[in-house]
C-alpha cells in the first residue's frame, strides 16, 4: 500500500472536490475549510507527468511550475512534484499538461505533496474573484471559525464561532453561492459570520457582512 492510499480516508473527511467515482466518495466542503485544513495551497501549471509503479494501480507524479503559494511555507516552501493515485476509483486526480493553471490543495507526507479528487482542485480561470481574494487573506482570517453544513431543515448554529452553510439546500445545488462568494470570518465580539467579497448581494444569506 502506498502512503497515498493511507491518506485517502483522511482526505475525504475534510476536503472539497468532485463527487466520487466508483469507490471514491467525497464529502462536500466549503473552499475555506479546504484551505484551512490543507498543508499546501498553491497555484501552479502542470508541465509533465509520469506513472510510477507503486501500489496496485501505480501513482501519478505530476511535475508542476509553482506560480504562487498561499499556505504551507513552513512545510514545503517550493513544490515541484505532486502525487496522486493513478486510479480514479481511489480518488486519483487527472490534470491537463501544459494547458491550464490550477489551484491545488493537498497534504504533505514524508516530504511529498499528495492530492486527489477529494481535495479542492480547480482550474484557476474557473475561480470567482471572491475565491481568489479568499485565498490571499480572507480564508486565513476565518480558520478559527467553523463552517457548519446544513443538508436539511431545520438547522441552526450552536456556537458563536459557527457559520451555517446552506448551499446544499438551494435550487442551484453544490457548489453554490456561499462557496463561490463568501468567507466565514470572525467579527467584533468574537462572533463568526459570512463576509461577502466582490459579488452581487444575495438576500437569502443570513448574517452576511458587506466589504
Swiss-Prot record:
GO cellular component: basement membrane; extracellular matrix; extracellular space
Chief location bin: secreted
GO molecular function, one term: metalloendopeptidase inhibitor activity
Record-annotated disulphide pairs: 24-91, 26-118, 36-143, 145-192, 150-155, 163-184
Region (Involved in metalloproteinase-binding): 24-27, 88-89
Region (Mediates interaction with EFEMP1): 105-188
Signal sequence region: 1-23
Record domain NTR: where: 24-143
InterPro entries named in the record: Netrin_domain, TIMP, TIMP-like_OB-fold, TIMP_C, TIMP_CS
Family: Belongs to the protease inhibitor I35 (TIMP) family.
Protein name per UniProt: Metalloproteinase inhibitor 3
Organism: Rattus norvegicus
Protein encoded by which gene: Timp3
Amino acid at each position: 500500500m502506498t502512503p497515498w492510499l493511507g491518506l485517502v480516508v483522511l482526505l475525504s473527511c475534510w476536503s472539497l472536490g468532485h463527487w466520487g467515482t466508483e469507490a471514491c466518495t467525497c464529502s462536500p466542503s466549503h473552499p475555506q475549510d479546504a484551505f484551512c485544513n490543507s498543508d499546501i495551497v498553491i497555484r501552479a501549471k502542470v508541465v509533465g507527468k509520469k506513472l510510477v509503479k507503486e501500489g496496485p494501480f501505480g501513482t501519478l507524479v505530476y511535475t508542476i511550475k509553482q506560480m504562487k503559494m498561499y499556505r504551507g511555507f513552513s512545510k514545503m516552501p517550493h513544490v515541484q512534484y505532486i502525487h496522486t493515485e493513478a486510479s480514479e476509483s481511489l480518488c486519483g486526480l487527472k490534470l491537463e499538461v501544459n494547458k491550464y493553471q490550477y489551484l491545488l490543495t493537498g497534504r504533505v507526507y514524508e516530504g511529498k505533496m499528495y492530492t486527489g479528487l477529494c481535495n479542492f482542485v480547480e482550474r484557476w480561470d474557473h475561480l470567482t474573484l471572491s475565491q481568489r481574494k479568499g485565498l490571499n487573506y480572507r480564508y486565513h482570517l476565518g480558520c478559527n471559525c467553523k463552517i457548519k453544513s446544513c443538508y436539511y431543515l431545520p438547522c441552526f448554529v450552536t456556537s458563536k464561532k459557527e457559520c451555517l452553510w446552506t448551499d446544499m439546500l438551494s435550487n442551484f445545488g453544490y457548489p453554490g453561492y456561499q462557496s463561490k462568494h463568501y468567507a466565514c470570518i470572525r467579527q467584533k465580539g468574537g462572533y463568526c459570520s459570512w463576509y461577502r467579497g466582490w459579488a452581487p448581494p444575495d438576500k437569502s444569506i443570513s448574517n452576511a457582512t458587506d466589504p
